[in-house]
Amino acid sequence: MADGSSDAAREPRPAPAPIRRRSSNYRAYATEPHAKKKSKISASRKLQLKTLLLQIAKQELEREAEERRGEKGRALSTRCQPLELAGLGFAELQDLCRQLHARVDKVDEERYDIEAKVTKNITEIADLTQKIFDLRGKFKRPTLRRVRISADAMMQALLGARAKESLDLRAHLKQVKKEDTEKENREVGDWRKNIDALSGMEGRKKKFES
């Protein structure tokens, strides 16, 4: 018996069912402070990892900058060869300067031509992009300003000379004179009196005579 009671005591108790809150308490539950879940990584470890990532990124940037400087130096060394000025006279130095100026002018012309081609390509790309947007119907709408205009002015702007004809709605209506309505009222009279007059023997006699 003792062993059975000890086994029952060792068994874990079932977790209680979660309490379902009412909809009226949702707002209070959302605003009340809750115990935040503790992350598996401590704050000091997070700071250490951030510092390490920043150091790695800094090293990568420095390495890329060094590679760009090396490529620039290699390109300049291949294109701009060192000048041999030892033992040159005044006339030879003048000729060398003329040659260098001619090379500079040629490079400037090539640079201008390349820039013109790039500008032309950019404009062509922009035109083609605009044509694509026009074909798709996705054009940029201009900004419209609010303008106060009456209905008459709007119809005048849309229809022109036909606006007056369309706005004159009473022209197509049938005009009824007041005298005609009074005459009809006199002829009809009170319908109750007509029914009373035609009811009974006298009414039948009147119908027979008519």
UniProtKB/Swiss-Prot annotation:
Write one Pfam family the protein is assigned to. Troponin
Q: Where is this region: Involved in binding TNC?
A: 32-79
PTM entry text:
Phosphorylated at Ser-42 and Ser-44 by PRKCE; phosphorylation increases myocardium contractile dysfunction. Phosphorylated at Ser-23 and Ser-24 by PRKD1; phosphorylation reduces myofilament calcium sensitivity. Phosphorylated preferentially at Thr-31. Phosphorylation by STK4/MST1 alters its binding affinity to TNNC1 (cardiac Tn-C) and TNNT2 (cardiac Tn-T).
Question: Matching InterPro entries, A to Z?
Answer: Troponin, Troponin-I_N, Troponin_I, Troponin_sf
The record's region (Involved in binding TNC and actin) falls at 129-149
> Which GO annotations describe the biological process of this protein?
cardiac muscle contraction; heart contraction; heart development; intracellular calcium ion homeostasis; muscle filament sliding; negative regulation of ATP-dependent activity; regulation of cardiac muscle contraction by calcium ion signaling; regulation of smooth muscle contraction
Q: Where is this site: Involved in TNI-TNT interactions?
A: C80, C97
Organism's domain of life?
Answer: Eukaryota
Single GO molecular function: calcium channel inhibitor activity
Alphabetical list of Gene3D superfamilies matching this protein: 1.20.5.350, 6.10.250.180
A Gene Ontology cellular component where this protein is annotated is: troponin complex
Q: Give the N-acetylalanine positions (modified residues).
A: A2
Q: Which keywords label this protein?
A: Acetylation, Actin-binding, Cardiomyopathy, Disease variant, Muscle protein, Phosphoprotein
Modification sites for Phosphoserine: S5, S6, S23, S24, S42, S44, S77, S150, S166, S199
| UniProt modified residues of type Phosphotyrosine | Y26
Q: Where is this region: Disordered?
A: 1-43
Task: Describe its partners and assembly state.
Answer: Binds to actin and tropomyosin. Interacts with TRIM63. Interacts with STK4/MST1.
PANTHER family per record: TROPONIN I (PTHR13738), TROPONIN I, CARDIAC MUSCLE (PTHR13738:SF2)
What the record says about family reads:
Belongs to the troponin I family.
- State its role: Troponin I is the inhibitory subunit of troponin, the thin filament regulatory complex which confers calcium-sensitivity to striated muscle actomyosin ATPase activity.
Give the protein's recorded name: Troponin I, cardiac muscle
Taxonomic source organism: Homo sapiens (Human)
Highest classification ranks of the organism: Eukaryota, Metazoa, Chordata, Craniata, Vertebrata
